[in-house]
UniProtKB/Swiss-Prot annotation:
It comes from Aspergillus niger (strain ATCC MYA-4892 / CBS 513.88 / FGSC A1513). The gene is otaD. This is Flavin-dependent halogenase otaD. Chloride binds at S304, G305. Flavin-dependent halogenase; part of the gene cluster that mediates the biosynthesis of ochratoxin A (OTA), a mycotoxin composed of a chlorinated type I polyketide dihydroisocoumarin moiety linked to L-phenylalanine, and demonstrated to have nephrotoxic, immunotoxic, genotoxic, neurotoxic, and teratogenic properties. The lineage of its organism: Eukaryota, Fungi, Dikarya, Ascomycota, Pezizomycotina. It catalyses: ochratoxin B + FADH2 + chloride + O2 = ochratoxin A + FAD + 2 H2O. One of its GO terms (molecular function) is flavin-dependent halogenase activity. Pathway: Mycotoxin biosynthesis. InterPro entries: FAD-bd (IPR002938), FAD/NAD-bd_sf (IPR036188), Flavin-dep_Halogenase_NPB (IPR050816), Flavin_halogenase (IPR006905). Induction: Expression is positively regulated by the ochratoxin cluster transcription factor otaR1, probably via its binding to the conserved 5'-ACGT-3' bZIP binding motifs found in multiple copies (3 to 4) in the promoters of the OTA biosynthetic genes. Expression is induced by sucrose, glucose and arabinose which repress the gal4 transcription factor, a negative regulator of the ochratoxin gene cluster. FAD binds at G14, G17, V306. The keyword Oxidoreductase applies. Keywords: FAD, Flavoprotein, Monooxygenase, Oxidoreductase. Its EC number is 1.14.19.-. PANTHER family: FAD-BINDING DOMAIN-CONTAINING PROTEIN, FAD-BINDING PROTEIN.
């Protein structure tokens, strides 16, 4: 099938966010073209595909911060999946095609062309996107015009970085990650009700944390996420020289996980990435929606990336469908999407900041109170954000969401004595700067926070065949 010259909606990027957007809009009978640069090995009815594929179910998560059950209301559907990311992306990409989108992999968008907007437009953007140039891995080139554009291009974020120039970084969450796949690891919680579940553990020196996630193919993903500056300091003082050796040395700093890996062997080479947290001043402009990592990224903690990608993908689809159907003007539709992404990002950022502060504080109380051994009370409050139910209509009340935001805001604000962050002796000079940055972020988010995804009296209408926006209080 040849890449067409015209589409109603062009989606750049076939990851979770882009594939979700494409699936949701294609099911509405809207003409969708989905372009993905790489070649791949509930609303869009993907659940059954994941269930039948054999991914390991993630019923709960446990960690050294607390042996805490993240299930909100136990039941048949209160689980997620531990997935091989490439296989997960492939399933979602194919689902978009099966839903009616014209999907092409191995095709990279190299440039976006814009037309000037009306003089009445006051937003700071290059204009209305009207076409895109592409290049395929086999050497073919071409262009495609469209009415609407969705940028789900991942961290490259072509719209934010190249045209809108709206990306900013959060220096407190400048992390580096390294991970590998192990065979023969002892499952976590053998002989208990949580046997085989993922486990997350803070490093003993407070420099980061380690994940331990069993996969359906018999391997276990083990990754180390570490503050970049602290990682640099540790490498300088370490006796090892290779990245692989430093990864293995770092894993030893997680006592429980290192024990689980005693009988295991590292399968293949380790992988590395810079996990720098960033966000944007807006997540779109007229006829443009920005989704997932293309607009914002926080941290692997609590799997925030996938949730923000999928919820943002649905938000983009809802707002585009609303614009096409005339539910509201386009300037209202794109701003509804942008505000919703900002709200969800803000909620998750506060929770991740609180967890990160607790990791670095080690034994000092951040998410708990003096004398409290665990963090069950804290997670009972922030659970709606971690699970994403804060973004699902009718699942939790606005009061519960607001409580989670308030709790997280208070947790990451600087304490009066400035003693909540405990770092290695070599990095104690970072304390005052870290405290101030976290306080500034918390204050800004708390000030800007809105407890529901309602903009100018509009909320999502999640009905197949009439996807779009409706006035708050209107049935159907």
């Amino acid at each position: 099938m040849e890449i067409p010259h015209k589409a109603t909606v062009l989606v750049i990027g076939g990851g979770p966010g882009g594939s979700y957007t494409a699936s949701a809009l294609a099911r509405e009978g809207i003409d969708i073209v989905l372009l993905e640069a790489d070649v791949f090995p509930r609303f869009i009815d993907l659940d059954e595909t994941f269930v039948n594929y054999g991914f390991v179910r993630k019923n709960a998560s446990h960690g050294s911060l607390a042996d805490t059950d993240f299930i909100l209301q136990p039941g048949a559907d209160t689980f997620a999946w531990n997935v091989v990311r490439s296989e997960c992306d492939d399933l979602m990409f194919k689902h978009a095609s099966n839903s009616g989108a014209r999907a092409f992999d191995g095709v990279k968008v190299t440039a976006i062309e814009f037309d000037p907007l009306d003089e009445s437009a006051i937003d700071d953007h290059p204009g209305r996107p009207v076409s895109a140039s592409w290049k395929a891995k086999d050497g073919r080139t071409g262009s495609i015009s469209f009415d609407y554009l969705v940028d789900a291009s991942g961290r490259a974020g072509i719209a934010s970085t190249k045209y809108l120039k709206s990306r900013t970084y959060n220096s407190y969450l400048k992390n580096v990650a390294s991970w590998g796949y192990w065979r023969g690891a002892t499952p976590y919680g053998v002989g208990t009700s949580v046997e085989g579940q993922p486990y997350f553990e803070a490093l003993q020196d407070g420099s980061g944390w380690v994940w331990f996630i069993p996969l359906h193919n018999g391997t276990t993903s083990v990754g180390v996420v570490m503050n970049q500056e602290l990682a640099t300091q540790k490498k300088k003082s370490s006796t090892v020289t290779s990245s692989r050796a430093f990864y293995l040395e770092s894993v030893e700093g997680a006592r429980v996980i290192s024990q689980l890996l005693q009988p295991a062997n590292l399968d293949g080479e380790i992988k590395q990435a810079s996990d720098w947290s960033y966000n944007a001043s807006s997540y779109g402009s007229p006829y443009l929606r920005i989704v997932g990592d293309a607009g914002a990224f926080i941290d692997p903690y609590f799997s925030s990336g996938v949730h923000l990608a999928v919820s943002g993908g649905l938000s983009a689809a809802v707002s585009i469908a609303a614009s096409i159907r005339g539910d509201c003007p386009e300037h209202t539709a794109w701003q509804w999407h942008s505000q919703g992404v900002a709200n969800r990002y803000g909620r998750f950022l506060l929770v991740v900041l609180g967890a990160t502060k607790q990791i670095r504080a080690r034994d000092s109380p951040v998410l708990n109170s003096e004398g409290q051994d665990g963090f069950d009370d804290a997670f009972a409050v922030i659970r709606p954000v971690i699970q994403g139910t804060a973004d699902v209509q009718g699942k939790v009340s606005a009061r519960e969401v607001l409580d989670a935001v308030t709790f997280s805001t208070n947790a990451v604000r600087p304490s009066a004595g400035g003693q909540n962050v405990v770092l290695e002796e070599s990095s104690r000079s970072l304390r005052s700067q870290v405290e101030q940055e976290m306080g500034d972020v918390a204050n800004s988010l708390a000030k800007a926070y809105k407890d529901t995804d309602v903009y100018e009296g509009l909320m999502a209408r999640l009905e197949r065949g009439s996807l779009g926006l409706k006035a708050v209080g209107v049935m159907g």
